[in-house]
A protein has these predicted regions:
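An acidic-aromatic substrate-binding cleft motif
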Residues: 261-356, 362, 366
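Aromatic- and carboxylate-enriched substrate-binding clefts and catalytic-loop regions
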Residues: 370-557, 561
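N-terminal accessory beta-strand-rich subdomains and adjacent acidic, glycine-rich linkers
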Residues: 25-296
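Bacterial N-terminal signal peptides
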Residues: 9-19
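Glycan-recognition and catalytic regions of carbohydrate-active enzymes
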Residues: 109, 581-606
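Catalytic domains of carbohydrate-active enzymes that cleave complex glycans
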Residues: 555, 565-577
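Conserved, mostly hydrophobic/aromatic
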Residues: 135, 359, 483, 571
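Bacterial N-terminal signal peptides that target proteins for export
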Residues: 1-9
Length: 606
């Protein structure tokens, strides 16, 4: 007993000498990860993480800076600390495996800020392959409505790691990845920022999550977030002298970074770590930190393999627009039946029937048709509010006839809702647009958010837009519609809770192969970065790599091979897989196309 008391006294003495007032620690279920949490002498919450005895995250501060209120950053004492263990196995509606184990040890620390009489909870969950933590704000008198000026979560790295990164940006993830040391990011940033339809880079050392790194001693570390709900998307800003990342939230039109009302929580901040790179790919931390499925009936949610009227527009053979006669249009005032067709419109009855016939013959589920609705003549770059109504087709696209024709062949059409960034307009028309889909036999929609946002000044990854994306998914579920969102915020595992979110783009996809290409290693990095948050609708399957016969593109060669295009169906998982090329190009290579027909979109194990 005397020896135990002596050890305890020594431990307390060490804490006092180091300036640490209070401390707690937990380990992962397999004991390989250890989290240490403390409140230092200034009342600042601090955490650190180790793996197999190696430091992964050096001591890092936690907190939030508030607007017009004292911050939640210091002056805290530890009021309570509770530990618990959780272990379950659940089945996803679709995915790479049939069952997922959700096993973690938890530490929930209640902190009291005496000067303001406010409490917050920081909740940590340690899994065998990493950690998640979040801020929780209980209902209380002195912390009710508050505005975030900045979240000050730190991730202090242990050295100048190799990172695989894209520039931090409030409006796009469609950049090529750069491989460099952390210390080299600043010097490489300018060259890494390439033109996009909407972009707002924010810092010479700002990067996006999911961020994959490798240490000199062989550890693989991934930083991301999970369950992004009613909050701004998190980027990371690097102090490149000390190798400390700090969270950097996406602002709104007036510069604020989040409007919260207690009780509420932040998203989870995630750290996946292993000495085996394969464990990063196999990790289910992002999904496990999301809530279970919100729907009782999921029988209507099905994985989809599809073709579509899309690549021929991307590659310049066809157009989204019906006519070239109009420099600008106002919906409801233009009589398209009196306009001269441009002869290159892709979404025609004849062309769509060709895709339907091909899909039916080869067992594909759906046919995407872009450019079917009025408004494409001046859809981009004009900051138009009322840009589409989502229900009025061009004269050469017979909605009822084509859907009946598809149904007779055992195929469905996939709807396309391009918003051109006019989110306010989309929400005004959303119920009508979804009902139009149901009335005409559609059960899936590809939505797009190309260009700058309306309301003007908002960003693609701000709190307002993140709430919109989720609103669209939940509203779609009311109509039993699945959503494939392009140009939206990168996924954070919400497909577990809302499995009708069946697809996302949110990265540099196949379309860039027609615009000069991506770096050769781009698709090898996507599984370690972008796909950590959820599946990607990469739209692979380009067989004919010569594009010069299709239009006037400056780059007439797709930088790929047939073998690579087939491999992408396995390496870039998605329950929504497109065979993106023209049907006539597949008909030349039916031996290779057999692989696309056979490859699964829903796996029991992989």
């Amino acid at each position: 007993m005397k020896a135990i008391c002596t050890k305890l006294a020594c431990f307390l003495l060490v804490l006092l000498v180091s300036g640490v007032a209070m401390a707690e620690s937990i380990t992962s279920p397999n004991g390989q990860l250890q989290l240490n949490f403390s409140v230092n002498a200034q009342g600042e919450p601090v955490y650190e993480l180790s793996y197999k005895g190696k430091p992964v995250i050096n001591p890092s501060k936690l907190g939030l800076e508030l607007k017009n209120d004292p911050g939640l950053m210091n002056g805290f004492t530890m009021e309570d600390a509770k530990t618990s263990t959780f272990d379950e196995t659940w089945e996803p509606v679709w995915g790479e495996v049939k069952q997922i184990r959700n096993h973690y040890n938890e530490l929930a620390v209640t902190l009291n800020q005496k000067a303001q009489d406010r409490n917050i909870i920081i909740r940590f969950r340690l899994f065998d392959d990493g950690m998640g933590f979040r801020y929780e704000f209980p209902l209380q008198k002195n912390l009710n409505y508050f505005v975030i000026k900045e979240e000050r979560t730190q991730f202090a790295m242990t050295g100048d790691h190799t990172a695989f990164w894209i520039p931090g940006d409030y409006d796009t993830q469609e950049y090529d990845y750069t491989e460099s040391k952390l210390s080299e990011i600043r010097g490489l940033m300018k060259g890494a920022i390439t033109p996009n339809s909407s972009q707002t880079p924010f810092s010479p050392t700002g990067v996006q999550t999911s961020l994959q790194m490798k240490t000199a001693d062989g550890l693989y570390i991934n930083l991301h977030e999970a369950a992004l709900v009613d909050y701004s998307c998190m980027h990371l800003n690097l102090d490149d002298k000390n190798f400390v990342f700090e969270s950097w939230l996406t602002p709104d039109a007036v510069g604020d970074k989040g409007y919260l009302q207690a009780p509420c929580t932040s998203p989870w901040r995630t750290v996946i770590v292993s000495d085996d790179a394969r464990d990063i790919l196999a990790s289910k931390i992002t999904l496990n930190l999301n809530e279970p499925c919100a729907y009782e009936d999921v029988s209507w949610i099905k994985p989809v393999k599809y073709v579509g009227v899309w690549w021929e527009m991307i590659a310049g053979k066809s157009t989204w627009a019906y006519t070239d006669d109009l420099p600008s249009i106002k919906l409801g005032e233009v009589d398209y039946s009196k306009m001269k067709p441009n002869g290159r419109h892709g979404a025609t009855n004849e062309n769509v029937k060709k895709y339907i016939d091909f899909a039916a013959e080869h067992g594909l589920d759906q046919v995407l048709v872009e450019g079917w609705n009025e408004g494409w003549e001046d859809w981009f770059g004009k900051s138009k509010d009322y840009v589409f109504d989502f229900v009025t087709p061009y004269p050469d696209f017979d909605v009822k006839m084509l859907n009946e024709y598809a149904k007779s062949k055992g195929v469905k059409l996939m709807m396309h809702h391009e918003t051109s960034g006019s989110v306010r307009n989309y929400e005004r028309h959303m119920d009508k647009a979804y009902q139009f889909m149901v009335d005409n036999g559609y059960n899936a929609v590809k939505s797009g958010y190309v260009g700058n946002m309306i309301p003007r000044g908002e960003h693609h990854y701000g709190q307002w837009l993140n709430n919109h994306y989720l609103y669209a998914v939940k509203k779609a579920a009311d109509y039993k519609i699945c959503v494939n969102a392009h140009e939206a915020v990168r996924p954070t595992g919400l497909c577990r809770t809302y499995p009708n979110l069946i697809g996302n783009e949110s990265a540099r996809g196949t379309e860039y192969e027609a615009f000069g290409g991506s770096k050769p290693f781009h698709t090898t990095l996507l599984p370690f970065n972008r796909l950590i948050g959820g599946p990607m609708d990469y739209t692979p399957g380009i067989f004919d790599t010569k594009l010069d016969f299709m239009g006037d593109l400056p780059h007439g060669q797709v930088q790929t091979t047939l073998a690579k295009q087939l491999a992408l169906y396995v390496t870039l998982y998605s329950p929504l897989q497109m065979a993106a090329d023209l049907v006539e190009n597949y008909e030349k290579h039916m031996d290779a196309f057999q692989f696309i027909k056979d490859v699964a979109v829903d796996w029991d194990d992989s």
